[in-house]
Every structure is written in C-alpha cells, then in structure tokens.
C-alpha cells in the first residue's frame, strides 16, 4: 500500500537531509576522499560520487575512458576558486550566498559544470532583481548562457517598459539578433508601430555602415501593416537608410500592396526532417502535423500588447479601483485599493500617470512633525498602487494640478488642531521623487478645484478664512514663477466639479452661501471670459466632471433628498450623466454604478488585457 503523498514527501525530505548531512560530515573529516579539485593553487577535497550525482559534466568525465577522469587530482581552468568553493559548499549543504556581485560568476560556473539546482537558484535571483538598469544585461546573459527562462523574463521586462528602456543608450548597443528578439515580441508595450521603426533606425544610425546591412532582416520584425500609409510614404521611404536600399523598398511595396488588399500567396511551411514520421509525414505528439500557410514576416499585422489601450473613467475609492468604459457600458476591475485613504484627491497627468494624495499618515521616526498625507501612484504594469514619498504637510480639501514634470498640491485645510486654512503650495518633482515648496497662493483657500491646461495651473473658487464661498480664479505660470488673477466666476461656490473640455474650463454644481446649485459655467482661456453652460438637472455638491474623447460626463455627488421621516438630508448618488452636444442637454446613462461610492474620477488610458471584466 502506497504512503499518503504528504507522508511520503516528509520521509523523502528526512532521507535527503540525513544523506546530505552524512556526506558533509565525511567531507569535514576527510573520510572516503577520492578526488581533489585544483584551481589556481587552491585544493578542494571531495567525493567523485557526489560530484557525478550533482553534475552531468563530472559524471561524463568520471565514466569516460579518458586519462583525466581517472586522476585523483583534477586541474580546472577558467574558474574562480572562491566561486567553486561556494558551489561545492552548496552541493554538500544546500546553502549558498548569492549577491548581485557574485551571481553572474556563480551562474556561469554552474552553467559550465551543468549543475541545474544552482542554475535555477541563480535564475530566480536574477528574475527578482530585474530593474531598468540591469534588464538588458540580464537579457544578454540569458542568451549567452542559453537560458530561455531568464532571457524571456528579461525580454518581457524590456517589452513592458519599452518606452523607458529605449531612451537608454545601452539599448542601442544590442546586436541585430538581440534587437530582433525584443521587437518581434507580441508583448511589446507600445501604442503605435511607428515607435518600433523609429527605434530601429536610431539603432542603425549609431553604426550606419555596419548596421544598415542588417536592416532587411530586422524590417521583417516591424509590423508595417499597422503603420498608416502616409507615414510609410513620408517618413519610412524617405529615410536616408531606406530610400537607397532596393531590397527595403521592395519589402515596403509589398506592405503597401497588402494595405490595398493585394496579399501575396501564402508560403506553405513544411515540417522539418527531425519531426517526420516513418513515411515522411510530420508528427507532433503522435498527431499528423498539418502544413501551415504563412505570409512573409513583414506582413505580420498582429496587434502588440500595448495597442489594447482604451479611454476609460477610472473610479478610485478605498475599496477598489474600477474602470468604466462608457462606449461599451462595461466595467473592469483594476485593483484592490486597501492603501487608498477615504478623503483623497486624484490626478491624471498628460502622460497618463495616475496619482492619489490625502488621508493621514503618521511617521513615528519624525518626532518633530510626524503627521503627513499619503501619496500614491498607480502602476499600470502590476495594476497596483505604489507608495511614494508622503506629502510633508497633512491636509484635506486641497487641489492637485500638474505642469511639465511637477505636481502641485495647493491650499486646503491643515489636519492639525485649529484646522488652519492654507495658502501654501507643495511641489512634487517627478524625476527626483522629492517634495518641495512652490510660490504660495495669493490667498488662503479650501474646498476649491484645480485644473491644468497648457502647462498652466488654475485655481477656482472654494472658501476663504471667513468660510464664505469665493468667485476668485487664479492661474500659476511655473516658468515665470508667478500667480495671476483672472476673471472671477459668475457664482461663488465650493465643493464643485471641474474639467477642461474642448479647450474651455468647465465648473459644475457645488455649494454656494445659500445652498446647493446646479449651474454650470464655462471659462474661455483665450478671451478670459465666463459664459453660462447648460444647467445640470439636479442641485448637487461634489459633482465630478470628466472629459474624455470629446464627450463630457458628470458623475455622482451629493444631493439633498427627503427621507422617510420627512427630513431633508444629504444623500450620495452614484449615477453617470453624459452631455449631448447637439441637443445641448444632459442625458442619464447609468442610474447607479458599483464602486462609485466615495470615489474620485479621472479619465485614463488603460490596457484592457490587464483588467478583469466585471
């Protein structure tokens, strides 16, 4: 009767430990030593049986009739004695210290002597250490040592972050084969195929005479059928390295013909002789292999991974982040948001980076000023929130804006005793990941909104020290380091929605000194004038406005409704409205949407392949 799996595993582990401990004890006491490895003057006594059991390299040596395999002392060349010492220690103990400094040497020696267990440990270590600065080196190492697992992991890392890595000069040191291995991948995270062409030509121009010869082969990995015809005509065919190469022009003509529907006859791919059966027929896993029909590589029109981006309304709350696609009326689960504070402000930058700030963060290490606010960034690759340097000043009811590489956190109320209204402006520098102070606002304000347009930051409305709603509008020019007053709003308000829509700044609903309002105003940045806009159907506070693909949406907020007792109380609404530009009216498209409660809303471009449809 067979033993249960768990018990059998326990017995196996016990026996392995007993055997390994016994072998190590014999090594320590020089018992049954029948082999000495000599490396650069250092000697390593060991057992032939142990080496043969762990390494096919040594097994083949000892079982051969070669003179070297019969010697007790074996000289090894091109090996570092310290590295070999670590490997022998691992063989006898299963213990090895791998660091960023020694991993490549250990990896190479393990590969040389065919020790799969150490090889696997090194691969796992390098996979965990993959980063922007080493991914290309690890990719090349994986190819050099013929390790597909490592090479593919590093290549996928490069493909995911292609925009960033293609900026690094090291990328342009890749060999033609290495470059092809990257750009031929379906997982390339790019929106437009033109980016691949531009990177390839930049690579070729680095060593023009030498690399131009490789372009006909490399062009097979560029998916020209995904590139607009005008771009091919005006950019590709007119490039200095292309227009003088007849072979490249011939390939491009094939692409243009294909774009017009004139595809060449597909070539039948026959199985190789290695996979043929007795009668010459292709056999795969016992089944007959059908002949495949394939077009030339340059006519490949399979979409890249990064081409599955969609514009969505991104809803961020303390329970989860959900993406809503209004065009298809579909919701996608994006991320759990356990780190997101309830009272937060969100921001989507021009580069599609998503940030959240707010809440209360207590730092025990900072004895003088332990209170700060959370600051998080959404990681599109892992669909998770990354903790960024916290906001130095804990505050609420502030606004977020952006210009170039800076994020501005403006005004608000201090989360300390007294709840002082602030005029201070904090500036987060994205390249250096550091907070600093910027020019203060000319007045103290909270409950306002902030929008960004053409690298200018606008502050609108809110309440001042006297708790009265403001009409005031200011704009900050980061290049001139100055604030400037603009034409005031028609209605003083706070806690309202705002967005930039078709070049104009819109503000909607909110709280006035006499109650809620449903009025909407539009500010023309060119004329510095406000004009009335179609009213929202209901008076609300904290209504969110989102402009996406030329369409204006209004989401959620709080309205005053009558409860069962006849009392009028603020009620949160989770509906979505769309503005009909032709008929100039608001149309409800969803009565209630999940996860909208307590959420903030931004327009974001998200890859639907990374999301889970709800």
Swiss-Prot record:
BP-aspect Gene Ontology terms: positive regulation of proteasomal ubiquitin-dependent protein catabolic process; positive regulation of protein ubiquitination; skeletal muscle fiber development; skeletal muscle fiber differentiation
Location(s), subcellular: Cytoplasm; Cytoplasm, Myofibril, Sarcomere, A band; Cytoplasm, Myofibril, Sarcomere, I band
Signal peptide bounds: none
UniProt entry keywords in alphabetical sequence: Cytoplasm, Developmental protein, Kelch repeat, Repeat, Ubl conjugation pathway
Classification via Gene3D superfamilies: 1.25.40.420, Kelch-type beta propeller, Potassium Channel Kv1.1, Chain A
Statement: the UniProt record of this protein carries the keyword Repeat: yes
Kelch repeats: 353-405, 406-455, 456-503, 505-550, 552-606
Domain (BACK): residue spans on this chain: 135-237
Predominant location: cytoplasm
CDD domains linked: BTB_POZ_KLHL40_KBTBD5
Ranges of residues in domain BTB: 33-100
GO terms for cellular component: A band; Cul3-RING ubiquitin ligase complex; cytoplasm; I band
SMART domains, per database record: BACK (SM00875), BTB (SM00225), Kelch (SM00612)
Record's subunit section: Component of the BCR(KLHL40) E3 ubiquitin ligase complex.
Function: Substrate-specific adapter of a BCR (BTB-CUL3-RBX1) E3 ubiquitin ligase complex that acts as a key regulator of skeletal muscle development.
Family the UniProt entry places it in: Belongs to the KLHL40 family.
Protein name in the entry: Kelch-like protein 40
């Amino acid at each position: 009767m067979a033993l249960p799996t768990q018990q059998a595993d326990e017995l196996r582990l016990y026996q392995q430990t007993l055997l390994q401990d016994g072998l190590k004890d014999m090594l320590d006491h020089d018992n049954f030593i029948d082999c000495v490895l000599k490396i650069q003057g250092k000697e390593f006594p060991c057992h032939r049986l142990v080496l043969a059991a762990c390494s096919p390299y040594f097994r083949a040596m000892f079982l051969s009739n070669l003179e070297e395999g019969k010697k007790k002392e074996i000289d090894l060349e091109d090996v570092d004695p310290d590295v070999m010492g670590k490997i022998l220690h691992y063989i006898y103990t299963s213990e090895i210290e791998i660091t960023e400094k020694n991993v490549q040497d250990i990896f190479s020696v393990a590969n040389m002597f065919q020790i799969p267990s150490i090889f696997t440990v090194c691969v796992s270590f390098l996979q965990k250490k993959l980063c922007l600065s080493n991914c290309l080196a690890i990719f090349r190492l994986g190819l050099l040592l013929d390790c597909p697992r490592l090479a593919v992991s590093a290549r996928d890392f490069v493909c995911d972050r292609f925009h960033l890595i293609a900026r690094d000069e090291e990328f342009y040191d890749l060999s033609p084969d290495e470059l092809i291995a990257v750009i031929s991948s379906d997982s390339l995270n790019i929106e437009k195929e033109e980016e691949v062409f531009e990177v390839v030509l930049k690579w070729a121009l680095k060593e023009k005479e030498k690399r131009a010869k490789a372009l006909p082969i490399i062009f097979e990995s560029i998916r020209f059928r995904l590139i607009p015809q005008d771009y091919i005509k005006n950019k590709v065919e007119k490039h200095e390295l292309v227009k003088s190469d007849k072979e490249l022009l011939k390939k491009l003509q094939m692409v243009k013909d294909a774009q017009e529907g004139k595809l060449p006859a597909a070539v039948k791919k026959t199985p190789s002789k290695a996979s043929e059966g007795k009668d010459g027929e292709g056999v795969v896993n016992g089944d007959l292999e059908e002949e495949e029909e394939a077009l030339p590589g340059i006519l490949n029109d399979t979409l890249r991974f990064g081409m599955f981006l969609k514009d969505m309304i991104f809803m961020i709350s303390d329970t989860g982040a959900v993406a809503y696609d209004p065009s298809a009326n579909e919701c996608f689960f994006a991320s759990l948001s356990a780190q997101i504070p309830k009272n937060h402000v969100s921001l989507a930058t021009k580069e599609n980076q998503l940030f959240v700030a707010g809440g209360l963060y207590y730092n025990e290490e900072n004895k003088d000023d332990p209170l700060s606010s959370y600051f998080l960034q959404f990681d599109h690759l892992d669909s998770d929130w990354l903790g960024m340097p916290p906001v130095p000043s804990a505050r609420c009811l502030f606004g977020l804006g952006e210009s170039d590489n800076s994020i501005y956190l403006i005004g608000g109320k201090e989360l300390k005793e007294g709840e002082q209204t602030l005029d201070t402006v904090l500036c987060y520098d994205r390249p250096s990941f550091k907070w600093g102070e910027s020019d203060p606002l000319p007045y103290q304000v909270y409950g306002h909104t902030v929008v960004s347009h053409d690298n200018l930051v606008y502050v609108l409305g809110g309440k001042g020290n006297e708790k009265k709603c403001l009409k005031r509008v200011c704009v900050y020019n980061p290049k001139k380091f100055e604030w400037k007053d603009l034409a005031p709003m028609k209605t003083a308000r706070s806690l309202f929605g705002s967005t930039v829509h078709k070049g104009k700044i819109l503000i909607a609903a909110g709280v006035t000194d006499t109650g809620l309002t449903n009025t909407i105003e539009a500010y023309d940045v060119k004329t510095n004038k406000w004009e009335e806009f179609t009213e929202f159907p209901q008076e609300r506070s904290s209504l969110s406005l989102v402009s996406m693909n030329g369409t204006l949406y209004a989401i959620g907020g709080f309205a005053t409704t009558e409860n069962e007792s006849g009392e009028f109380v603020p009620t949160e609404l989770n509906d979505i409205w769309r503005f009909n530009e032709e008929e100039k009216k608001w149309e409800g498209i969803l009565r209630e949407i999940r996860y909208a409660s307590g959420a903030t809303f931004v327009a974001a471009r998200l890859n639907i392949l990374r999301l889970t449809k709800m």
